[in-house]
Design a protein with these regions (language model features):
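Residues that define the transmembrane beta-barrel architecture of outer-membrane proteins
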Residues: 21-23, 45-51, 100-106, 124, ...
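Transmembrane beta-strands of outer-membrane beta-barrel proteins
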Residues: 23-29, 51, 66-70, 106, ...
Length: 204
């Protein structure tokens, strides 16, 4: 994790001192489709739908298509856990429970945008991106069978289209790299976030 933070700091410092870089920002909203990937398949986990909203910034180097995007956003993740499928939990009265995970997330991505398409880029320009996503838990469901961690580190990749140089529509997948939830009864039964996202950004 230390290496990731150092890499982020290096990239941010490099861009901050480049006078030719173009920065803009705007609001973003989207939908999350999340599940929790446990170490062992002791019970089924159903994907749940959440939402996200926040601010996204973009800094691009003119002429070469490379840049960086950063964001600060609220995200609702989680999944439905069918704990009642195992006697160890059903005997305590547990059944199917929706586990809500509320995060403040800070994605930082390197991106490449196709900007030399003979004028077509003024109307539509595809782009790809990838980088770390650092999230801090704000709140969670009260499920006594679970323990929760305070922070989550993920890696995400995605693609999208810029429309009329103002709107961006993108889809991404986030791999949780650290465990966010674990069961209290079984010490080694923990889970990581797995999230598909669809998001719209409107830049000023």
């Amino acid at each position: 994790m230390k290496k990731i933070f150092l890499a982020i700091l290096f990239v941010a410092s490099f861009i901050a001192f480049d006078a030719s870089a173009q920065f803009r920002y705007g609001p973003t909203v989207g939908v999350d489709f999340t599940t929790l990937k446990f170490k062992q398949d002791l019970f089924t986990v159903d994907q749940s739908v959440g939402y996200q909203a926040g601010i996204q910034g973009e800094m691009m180097f003119p002429g070469i298509g490379f840049g960086i995007d950063i964001g600060a956003m609220y995200e609702q993740r989680g999944a439905t856990l069918n704990l009642g499928e195992k006697k160890v939990w059903s005997s305590q009265g547990y059944g199917s429970h929706r586990s809500y995970l509320h995060y403040l997330s800070f994605p930082i991505n390197l991106r490449f945008k196709w900007t030399r398409m003979n004028g077509l880029e003024d109307y539509i320009a595809p782009y790809v991106f990838g980088g770390p996503n650092i999230s801090f838990m704000l709140a969670h469901s009260s499920i006594d069978a679970l323990d929760y961690t305070t922070a989550d580190l993920g890696l995400q990749v995605g693609l999208g289209f810029e429309v009329l140089k103002r709107w961006q529509i993108q889809a991404s997948y986030n791999w949780g790299m650290t465990y966010c939830v674990k069961t209290k009864i079984l010490d080694d039964h923990s889970a990581k976030n797995r999230t598909w996202s669809v998001r719209v950004v409107r830049f000023f």
